[in-house]
Amino acid sequence: MKMSKEKGSQFLLAEYVNNQSVWLNSQILKSSVQLLNEINDELVIEWISPLKQNDYREYRDNFLNVLGVSGAIPNDIWPKRGPVWDGLAKAKGNSGEEIILLVEAKAHLSEMKSELRATSLDSVIVIRKTFQKFRQRNGIDEKYADVWENCYYQLANRLIYLDYLNHTLNIKTYLVLINFVDDNTHVKTSLQDYLSHYKKVFHEMGISHLNLLNYVILCYI
């Protein structure tokens, strides 16, 4: 998939990745003590998408191949036509292992609202079963199920991928949520609004206690 907008989060992410990547990388690293400790001394983050030379292409089911990492998300965990990633990047760990960064960009709060839109009953069954197993395994009450499906579905499915990559495929993975503060290309959102919103989202999803959040990087630009 290709970026088409010339405003908002997609546009801003592409601008930073292609024109200010060193600065962008520093903002990501300073937002996560854990990643800073795990990345090697060169502190290099290599961006795979969205790149100008690739027409700002975004990737979907083949994202691991694009990152040069072996493995796949099986269809009994998530159906085909899974998440489209705003950005992909990778780095080397202290022992030479691959670290991958799955990136989502936001420029205003309404971008964070999402709901399950799968039309195939088989797909819906797989998604709900995967969500339910994740919640049970992590001590999350089923009273939050509706919020996962109808309010913050995008974040919920990103957490599934983050968990599977780290704990089943043993691929060191971070979910980087890049938030553009006071975006002057579209809709302005203050830092305080972002902070309050994420606190509210984590509470409403019942995930405030998750150790997996150590692999979620909230970056404000």
Give short role names for the model-derived ranges.
Residues G96-E97, L109-S114, D183-V187:
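Short catalytic/ligand-binding loop motif for oxyanion handling, primarily in non-cytosolic enzymes
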Residues A156-I221:
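Non-catalytic C-terminal interaction segments of nucleic acid-processing enzymes
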Residues M1-E46:
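Charged, often low-complexity linker/regulatory segments
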Residues L102-L109, I178-D182:
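Short loop/turn segments at strand-loop or loop-helix junctions that form parts
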Residues M112-Y174:
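Acidic, metal/cofactor-coordinating or nucleic-acid-engaging core segments within structured domains
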Residues G93-E98, T168:
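Short, solvent-exposed loop/turn segments that connect beta-strands within catalytic domains
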Residues G87-A89, I99-A107, R158:
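Conserved catalytic cores of phosphodiester-cleaving nucleases, focusing on short active-site segments
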Residues Y56-S95:
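Active-site metal-binding core of divalent-cation-utilizing nuclease and nuclease-like domains
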